[in-house]
Amino acid sequence: MDDLHGRNGRMHIGVAQNPMHVQYEDHGLHHIDNENSMMDDHADGGMDEGVETDIPSHPGNSADNRGEVVDRGIENGDQLTLSFQGQVYVFDRVSPEKVQAVLLLLGGREVPHTLPTTLGSPHQNNRVLGLSGTPQRLSVPQRLASLLRFREKRKGRNFDKTIRYTVRKEVALRMQRKKGQFTSAKSSNDDSGSTGSDWGSNQSWAVEGTETQKPEVLCRHCGTSEKSTPMMRRGPDGPRTLCNACGLMWANKGTLRDLSKVPPPQTPQHLSLNKNEDANLEADQMMEVTGDISNTQ
């Protein structure tokens, strides 16, 4: 330490804390704080350059190495500031070799040989200052730029429901309607199927109507109507030419039955006449019974 108290040593009395603060800087206006290490630039706007570091009060304890090394370049006239127990020592025109010797003697730290000339990004500053554990924060211009990019990108995102009326109109014109309302293709197919079935049923009804208009079929052997027999059967003249009884006789024996033993077939008119005669006969019998009862009394 004797060679550092040389010709240009100046002692300044001030208020400081126990950690020794060593500053190696250029001629300029700088503000040194033990906690935050704030640096103010020169009034002319130029960036003065220098090296600043904190040296612990106990050299043997490596846990107290909470220091900073800020590089601002090397020029001819450099200052070395030592603060210890409230006293500040300032030395002018100190070579980097002497500062290196002091750092090695006190803290075992070395000054990098090639020091950057300008202050870089916060990440680079933290790496130079030895504060790798501190969180990285973007500067204000970078944050503004990122916010602007995010807002521009957000403008491209459209979360609103935009209604394209032209497209909707084309779709509406292509869709099928029933009584003015939209219907699906399935329902339209069902409707077409139902209309087809209705048409088929109507056609069958028309066929039935035409069938009712056909002449009544009679048995060609006995003259029995098709309505009076269970079914018409095949005969020698073809299908549906014989009544049920004649057709069975023909199918089993190959001959037609004898009509002399069979009562004549009764037509519906004959049946109605027989019913009327039976009713009249019953009425006469009832009258006779009532007459006999009155005579006995």
Curated annotation (Swiss-Prot):
**Which ranges carry the Tify domain?**
73-108
User: Region labeled Disordered — which residues?
Assistant: 178-203
| Subcellular compartments | Nucleus
Q: Where is the composition biased (Low complexity)?
A: 190-201
**Do you know which SMART domains this protein is assigned to?**
TIFY, ZnF_GATA
* PROSITE patterns on file: CCT, GATA_ZN_FINGER_1, GATA_ZN_FINGER_2, TIFY
Zn-finger segments (GATA-type): 213-269
Q: What are the residue boundaries of the CCT domain, all occurrences included?
A: 143-185
Tissue specificity comment: Predominantly expressed in shoot apices, inflorescences and roots.
> Keywords for this entry?
Activator, DNA-binding, Metal-binding, Nucleus, Transcription, Transcription regulation, Zinc, Zinc-finger
- The reply on keyword Amino-acid biosynthesis is no
* Annotated Pfam families: CCT, GATA, tify
- Chief site of localization: nucleus
Sorted alphabetically, which SUPFAM superfamilies does this protein's record hold?
A: Glucocorticoid receptor-like (DNA-binding domain)
Tell me a GO biological process for this protein: regulation of DNA-templated transcription
Q: Which terms in the Gene Ontology molecular function aspect does this entry carry?
A: identical protein binding; transcription cis-regulatory region binding; zinc ion binding
Family matches, as InterPro entries: CCT_domain, TIFY-like, Tify_dom, Znf_GATA, Znf_NHR/GATA
> Which purpose does this protein serve, as stated in its record?
Transcriptional activator that specifically binds 5'-GATA-3' or 5'-GAT-3' motifs within gene promoters.
According to its UniProt record, which protein family does this protein belong to? Belongs to the type IV zinc-finger family. Class C subfamily.
The name this protein carries in UniProt is: GATA transcription factor 24
From what organism does this protein derive? Arabidopsis thaliana
